[in-house]
Amino acid sequence: MDLFLTGTILKPKGLKGEVKVLPVTDFPELFLSRKSYLAGKSDASVMPLNVLKASLSKGFAWLFFEGVDTLEKAEKLSGMHLFVEEKELARQPTGRAYLHELIGMKVLDGNRYEAGVISDILKMPAHEVYEVQANGRKILIPAVEEFVEEIDMAGRYMVVPRFDEFL
């Protein structure tokens, strides 16, 4: 089961079990409608948490979970990550994709010959960088329009006309 990080529980608020969550998603408004999460220090050891009440304020989500009704119980959740399954991810608008959907995608050069395969996506301060496995080497390509001409999700390929410049 693939799990995807949506937020991190920072600390409790008040005495009734409310927790402050840092959203790590482009869709923080989904915290208002999502009814459950899988919570844990990692995606390998998670437990289900059902949401009783949710609100958003100043860039944070504030959540009450079923069975978490004291400060002590809420403190035990501090530092845990909130995950959802892939089927629960928000649909992306046309022309957009989740980063994990790009892993394994073919990279074509300007002549439309296969040059490599995306093996990872690195998050850098300015933009993401595609790590491409090509002929046993790792090639890093900035994820910007200047270098990436086309991404075809249906065909599972990306066109990088200036690929040779990265060799």
Swiss-Prot record:
Subcellular location: Cytoplasm
One GO CC term, this protein: cytoplasm
Keyword hit for Disulfide bond: no
Domain of life: Bacteria
GO biological process: ribosomal small subunit biogenesis; rRNA processing
Keywords: Chaperone, Cytoplasm, Ribosome biogenesis, rRNA processing
Subunit structure: Binds ribosomal protein uS19.
Domain notes: The PRC barrel domain binds ribosomal protein uS19.
HAMAP family per record: Ribosome_mat_RimM
Full protein name: Ribosome maturation factor RimM
